[in-house]
Amino acid sequence: MRKEILKKVKRVVIKIGSGVITSVDNGLDGDRIKGLAAEMAHFRQQGVEVVLVSSGAVAAGRLELGLSDRPRTIPQKQAAAAIGQSKLMRAYEEEFACHGIKVAQLLLTRDDLASRPRFLNARATIDTLLECGIIPIINENDTVVVEEIKFGDNDNLSALVTNLVEAQLLVILTDIDGFYTADPRTNPEARLIHLVRSITKETERAAGGSGSSVGTGGMATKIAAAKKVGKSGIPTIMVNGKKSGNLELVLAGTEVGTLFLPAGVSLNRRKHWIAYTQRPAGRVVVDNGAFRVLSQHGRSLLPSGVVQVEGKFDRGACVRICTPDGTEFARGITDYSSREMELIAGHKSGDIEQILGYRYGDDVIHRDNLVVL
């Protein structure tokens, strides 16, 4: 199965966690970066384009601040990132140069991908770099990011980048061998799972737990990333990045780590962007009838199905769509503002112009702009 998947891969996103290329005491692990660069160069030799999402800037910079552990405050984290990002890029630049490969740095915030024009511009930039034989190295712009525009962790960022660059595979390098039935660091009976056909609620529950002492992402964030790219029909392989040769085993189609198969029905790129990259500006609660036609029949949301509107947003905003009990089941781009939607909620589409004095259309959210989660 893996060999068949790898045959189709022409572009891969490789996410490297902090725990893979740094240590608690010594900052960056130069030997590990050297080994990974050599393995990624082998991908290039086999005709596979590589986009790298790398953590490690904060961990690389914290020693310069005299911190013995992961920064706990936002100013500390941003200062460590400002110091460490240049150290991280210099390490990659030196090791890839040994293989005749140039690298480029891209620092992103969520706003860069939530804005459709900036999303497309970022894609064009990365495509150009790849056409020139350059490996893009992407990280969150920790030096300026605030809670409202942060990705949360680089697992999430890697999933969004996989959609952005239209890769055929996401590889997540971590400091354990893959996905286990329990945390192998605390449970000696934990068993490695080589194949996950579908990410279920049970899978997500088994993934509970925190990250390493130098990173922010735990197993739960990695499962969430695999689920997101799976919605676009893209598989994920999670493997131990601290073990030399594992990346080459992945490329060869060897059963190493854990393979997460994609969902049966995949979202197109734009709907994936709506569902996972846009930051919702409000909430629209619908009645049970609207819930059924949206979730089961793929219809548009009409004003008659709207029960309540929460938040202030303009036309064209992304909103959460919820059942009467508050459970989110979909997201969509609105054709009306929150003020307009409040006025026409519960009314028939034919009444819109009489109520507002104008009319954009019959739907408050068109089915082409609506994604059931």
Curated annotation (Swiss-Prot):
<protein>
    <recommendedName>
        <fullName>Glutamate 5-kinase</fullName>
        <ecNumber>2.7.2.11</ecNumber>
    </recommendedName>
</protein>
<dbReference type="InterPro" id="IPR001048">
    <property type="entry name" value="Asp/Glu/Uridylate_kinase"/>
</dbReference>
<dbReference type="InterPro" id="IPR001057">
    <property type="entry name" value="Glu/AcGlu_kinase"/>
</dbReference>
<keyword id="KW-0547">Nucleotide-binding</keyword>
<dbReference type="GO" id="GO:0003723">
    <property type="term" value="F:RNA binding"/>
</dbReference>
<dbReference type="InterPro" id="IPR036974">
    <property type="entry name" value="PUA_sf"/>
</dbReference>
<dbReference type="InterPro" id="IPR011529">
    <property type="entry name" value="Glu_5kinase"/>
</dbReference>
<comment type="function">
    <text>Catalyzes the transfer of a phosphate group to glutamate to form L-glutamate 5-phosphate.</text>
</comment>
<dbReference type="InterPro" id="IPR041739">
    <property type="entry name" value="G5K_ProB"/>
</dbReference>
<keyword id="KW-0963">Cytoplasm</keyword>
<dbReference type="GO" id="GO:0004349">
    <property type="term" value="F:glutamate 5-kinase activity"/>
</dbReference>
<feature type="domain" description="PUA">
    <location>
        <begin position="281"/>
        <end position="359"/>
    </location>
</feature>
<comment type="similarity">
    <text>Belongs to the glutamate 5-kinase family.</text>
</comment>
<dbReference type="InterPro" id="IPR019797">
    <property type="entry name" value="Glutamate_5-kinase_CS"/>
</dbReference>
<keyword id="KW-0808">Transferase</keyword>
<feature type="binding site">
    <location>
        <position position="55"/>
    </location>
    <ligand>
        <name>substrate</name>
    </ligand>
</feature>
<dbReference type="GO" id="GO:0005524">
    <property type="term" value="F:ATP binding"/>
</dbReference>
<dbReference type="Pfam" id="PF00696">
    <property type="entry name" value="AA_kinase"/>
</dbReference>
<feature type="binding site">
    <location>
        <begin position="174"/>
        <end position="175"/>
    </location>
    <ligand>
        <name>ATP</name>
    </ligand>
</feature>
<comment type="pathway">
    <text>Amino-acid biosynthesis; L-proline biosynthesis; L-glutamate 5-semialdehyde from L-glutamate: step 1/2.</text>
</comment>
<keyword id="KW-0641">Proline biosynthesis</keyword>
<dbReference type="InterPro" id="IPR015947">
    <property type="entry name" value="PUA-like_sf"/>
</dbReference>
<dbReference type="Pfam" id="PF01472">
    <property type="entry name" value="PUA"/>
</dbReference>
<feature type="binding site">
    <location>
        <begin position="216"/>
        <end position="222"/>
    </location>
    <ligand>
        <name>ATP</name>
    </ligand>
</feature>
<dbReference type="GO" id="GO:0005829">
    <property type="term" value="C:cytosol"/>
</dbReference>
<dbReference type="GO" id="GO:0055129">
    <property type="term" value="P:L-proline biosynthetic process"/>
</dbReference>
<dbReference type="InterPro" id="IPR005715">
    <property type="entry name" value="Glu_5kinase/COase_Synthase"/>
</dbReference>
<feature type="binding site">
    <location>
        <position position="15"/>
    </location>
    <ligand>
        <name>ATP</name>
    </ligand>
</feature>
<keyword id="KW-0418">Kinase</keyword>
<keyword id="KW-0067">ATP-binding</keyword>
<feature type="binding site">
    <location>
        <position position="142"/>
    </location>
    <ligand>
        <name>substrate</name>
    </ligand>
</feature>
<dbReference type="InterPro" id="IPR036393">
    <property type="entry name" value="AceGlu_kinase-like_sf"/>
</dbReference>
<dbReference type="InterPro" id="IPR002478">
    <property type="entry name" value="PUA"/>
</dbReference>
<feature type="binding site">
    <location>
        <position position="154"/>
    </location>
    <ligand>
        <name>substrate</name>
    </ligand>
</feature>
<keyword id="KW-0028">Amino-acid biosynthesis</keyword>
